[in-house]
Design a protein with these regions (language model features):
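Perimembrane helix-loop-helix junctions
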Residues: 3-8, 12, 150-153, 182-214, ...
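Juxtamembrane membrane-water interface segments immediately following transmembrane helices
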Residues: 42-45, 49-53, 180-187, 203-272
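Short hydrophobic/aromatic helix or loop-helix immediately within or flanking a transmembrane segment
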Residues: 49-55, 63-86, 96-97
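Membrane-interface alpha helices of multi-pass inner-membrane proteins
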Residues: 161-177, 188, 210-214
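Transmembrane-helix signature of polytopic, membrane-embedded enzymes
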Residues: 103-128, 142, 343-344
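Membrane-interface anchor segments at the N-terminal boundary of transmembrane helices
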Residues: 89-90, 95, 284-354, 358
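Transmembrane-helix motifs of polytopic, lipid-linked glycan transferases
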Residues: 93-114, 146, 325, 329-330
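Short acidic/glycine- and proline-prone juxtamembrane loop motifs at membrane-interface regions
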Residues: 70, 132-140, 363-364
């Protein structure tokens, strides 16, 4: 009774339109501040790898750079601009243009222009910041987002641009090795395409030359190393430890209190640990890490799962949880997994996969494609008025608070 009275009062005073307009205004300001803050930062972190790749191309040529391993699609986009601008400026400018392309894509693909959807998208991009960094993640994410969204459109209303979807997937595939971690939901998506006969609409005459082009560009890498050219953060030449060993040791040290959370030991310290404790004292690769200490794997899985939900809430608000609730309700009702729940299923699967395989701290940016698709899913629910308006209002309240918090956090860093 009290809930109904509260709902009636909120409706009477037209709280929802007021909240929506307030959120859109604040998030616009938030996005301007975030854009300026992240673009004016000095280059650092993973950006240095791509700056070094550009320098390598300019000094040694494309053949040598591809043999060494670079992200070919990303470098092809950045290289022409790097001849006119500083390397890090060219890297970031390409990512800003890719972001604009993402907004244009959704504007073309969505049936109606929904201010709330673009507000949610701006909030997410402004909060995470990494779309403005000069790294290849933005191109990788863009390809996966377009591909998965097209598959979602196929299962939802049997309308999809299959050729665009496969081109986008090919771009992602040749951009980052991380694509292989997404294999479970990619296999799921191929099943959906098969079930809805989406393969029949593909323009094979266009797709085959594009695939041949990408394979041809990778020939130097195939001949030199026998694999696709992906950017690699290789350890120093005198180091024997692997990235998995360094990350695994990091979690061991964090658990015993000898290393701050979300930090790594030096490569030298990792090598010293292997010398002192034996070569088999740390797992050499990702698969070994899963079974090296089952108790630790299970413990860290739940820690990472909690961390993902906690920090994911900071990036998405209630948008993160509502599709998962919707999925649970659907499973309880139908006693099966329905294809109509594609996006919630993909979200849950990828959260669980990254929580399982990452023994040390997880970087939430790896989940960006499914997080943005979650925004798509939530905005569709909002448009179709499937959820009670109180949920929408509560989400606006949460995002308004988080937007003010984000603005304050960025402002204090100037």
């Amino acid at each position: 009774m009290l809930y109904q009275k509260l709902e009636l009062m909120l409706t009477k005073f037209k709280v929802l339109p007021l909240l929506q307009k307030s959120f859109l205004g604040i998030v616009f300001i938030y996005s301007i501040i975030a854009l300026y803050y992240f673009l004016q930062k000095s280059p650092g972190g993973d950006e240095m790898l791509f700056i070094a790749d550009l320098e390598l191309i300019k000094k040694e040529g494309w053949m040598h750079a591809i043999e060494k391993n670079i992200s070919i699609p990303y470098m092809l986009l950045v290289y022409p601009l790097s001849l006119l601008l500083k390397n890090y400026v060219a890297l970031r400018l390409v990512n800003v243009l890719l972001l604009i392309l993402l907004f244009v894509y959704f504007a073309k693909r969505k049936d109606t222009f929904e201010f709330s959807f673009y507000g949610y998208l701006l909030f997410f991009i402004s909060t995470v910041g990494y779309f403005f960094f000069g790294i290849n993640d933005t191109l990788f994410f863009l390809g996966l987002i377009i591909y998965l969204n097209e598959v979602n459109q196929l299962q939802k209303n049997n309308k999809w641009n299959g050729t665009l979807a496969i081109i986008a997937l090919l771009v992602s595939f040749f951009t980052r090795k991380l694509i292989f971690v997404y294999s479970p939901i990619l296999i799921f998506s191929w099943y959906i395409i098969y079930k809805y006969k989406g393969f029949k609409s593909l323009n094979i005459k266009l797709l085959i030359p594009i695939l041949v082009l990408f394979l041809g560009l990778n020939v130097p890498s195939f001949l030199h190393k026998g694999n696709i050219s992906y950017d690699l953060k290789n350890p120093p030449k005198n180091i024997k430890a692997t990235w998995t060993q360094r990350q695994y040791l990091a979690q061991l040290m964090v658990n015993e209190g000898s290393l701050p959370d979300q930090q790594h030991p030096s490569w030298e310290k990792t090598d010293a640990y292997l010398i002192a404790n034996g070569e088999n004292s740390l797992p050499e690769n990702l698969i070994d890490g899963l079974f090296f200490d089952i108790n630790l794997t299970v413990k860290e899985f739940f820690k990472e799962l909690y961390s993902c939900m906690f920090y994911g809430f900071r990036q998405l608000g209630l948008i993160l949880f509502i599709p998962l609730v919707f999925l649970i309700k659907d499973i309880l009702k139908t006693k099966k997994l329905n294809i109509s729940m594609m996006i919630p299923i993909c979200l849950l699967v990828m959260i669980c996969i990254f929580s399982l395989i990452i023994i040390s701290f997880m970087e939430l940016r790896w989940l960006a494609p499914v997080f943005i698709l979650t925004i798509v899913y939530f905005s569709d629910l909002q448009k179709e008025k499937i959820w009670n308006s109180t949920i929408i209002k509560a989400n606006y309240f949460v995002l308004l608070f988080l937007s003010f918090y984000g603005i304050f956090s960025l402002w204090t860093k100037f």
